[in-house]
Amino acid sequence: MLILTRRVGETLMIGDEVTVTVLGVKGNQVRIGVNAPKEVSVHREEIYQRIQSEKAGNPSEGGNF
């Protein structure tokens, strides 16, 4: 795992087309902005896991969203 230190307003690059920018820090929360091409899916981890579970035929409890 690569570990980086960034300040508010600073950006990191992932490949040639994806940027991640630190927008703000408040307590233990960090706001980030992700700029990626439309064909690149960007999800929070818990949403990504739910999508993968539903694709595998295991819908999450609570059902409709």
UniProtKB/Swiss-Prot annotation:
A key translational regulator that binds mRNA to regulate translation initiation and/or mRNA stability. Mediates global changes in gene expression, shifting from rapid growth to stress survival by linking envelope stress, the stringent response and the catabolite repression systems. Usually binds in the 5'-UTR; binding at or near the Shine-Dalgarno sequence prevents ribosome-binding, repressing translation, binding elsewhere in the 5'-UTR can activate translation and/or stabilize the mRNA. Its function is antagonized by small RNA(s). Gene3D superfamilies: Translational regulator CsrA. Belongs to the CsrA/RsmA family. InterPro entries: CsrA, CsrA_sf. It comes from the Bacteria. This is Translational regulator CsrA. The gene is csrA. Its main location: cytoplasm. It is found in: Cytoplasm. NCBIfam families: csrA, PRK01712.1. Transmembrane segments: none annotated. GO terms for biological process: mRNA catabolic process; negative regulation of translational initiation; positive regulation of translational initiation; regulation of carbohydrate metabolic process.
